Regions:
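Hydrophobic structural segments
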Residues: 1-247
């Protein structure tokens, strides 16, 4: 498949042109024209690129790519090394950020809900769905369940939360800023990837459980689902690589 055809295929599936994002979605660094072997991962880190080189990949597809708004345009150090690896080895880099958060089938939010057994009921605002657990559980039990499903112990704050958690809102990655919207909506718990200092105060003062389960851990689902979709719908050789990241 041509690299431009792969871009068009994913763009159409994820409806990527409809998003105003923090960076470009699609083909970010052009490599060889023909693509057959693809490595996917959460972030285009040097470790992921090195694995792509080791496996003679034609392309890398990630959720966190390059060229974010307001980042320095200077190419030196870590940024130089990453781009040099791609260009010297003629590897294409594709990045899909918000389109891979929001997709109703492959998106990070939907995939996290499926992993945790949450039935999606609706959306509080864009990128912030809410839903219900199959049965109410204590806050500590939900923390243990999140750890079991994601392989990472979440930071949990439940000082003033209800005895049992049933209604849950969530936003994968760095979604802690949505906690106030979730509280106003009236959920029992809010799950995201990251935590800020003020997040805990918001949780305590508004009476809900808060779980920071890891930016990386909560956003493996989308790129993994996209990998599976490509495998099922094309003849491409696609391999998801999980580069460990505790953050």
């Amino acid at each position: 498949m041509k690299n431009s055809e792969l871009e068009s295929l994913i763009n159409e599936k994820l409806n990527s042109t409809s998003f105003s994002d923090y960076g470009p979605n699609g083909l970010q660094v052009e490599g060889r024209e023909t693509v057959q072997k693809i490595i996917t991962g959460v972030t285009a880190s040097q470790a992921l690129l090195d694995e792509a080189v080791r496996q003679n990949a034609d392309a890398v597809i990630v959720h966190h790519g390059y060229f974010w708004k307001n980042e320095s345009p200077i190419i030196r150090g870590m940024k130089r090394n990453r781009l040099k690896t791609l260009l010297a080895n003629d590897i294409n880099l594709y990045g899909y950020h918000l389109p891979l958060d929001a997709h109703p089938e492959l998106g990070n939010n939907v995939q996290l809900a499926q992993l945790l057994g949450i039935t999606i009921m609706g959306e509080i605002e864009p990128l912030v769905p809410w839903g219900e657990l199959a049965m109410p559980v204590p806050g500590l039990e939900l923390a243990s369940w999140i750890e079991a499903r994601l392989g990472r112990r979440p930071l949990w704050s439940g000082d003033t939360g209800p005895d049992l958690v049933k209604r849950v809102a969530w936003c994968t990655g760095g979604g802690q800023g949505f906690i106030d919207s979730a509280a106003r909506f009236g959920v029992d718990a809010f799950i995201t990837g990251e935590v800020s200092e003020q997040t805990i105060h918001s949780a305590r003062e508004q009476g809900l459980h808060f779980y920071a389960a890891g930016h990386h851990a909560t956003e493996r689902g989308g790129i993994r689902a996209l990998s599976e979709w490509l495998t099922e719908n094309t003849d491409l050789d696609v391999t998801f690589i999980d580069i460990p990241n505790p953050a």
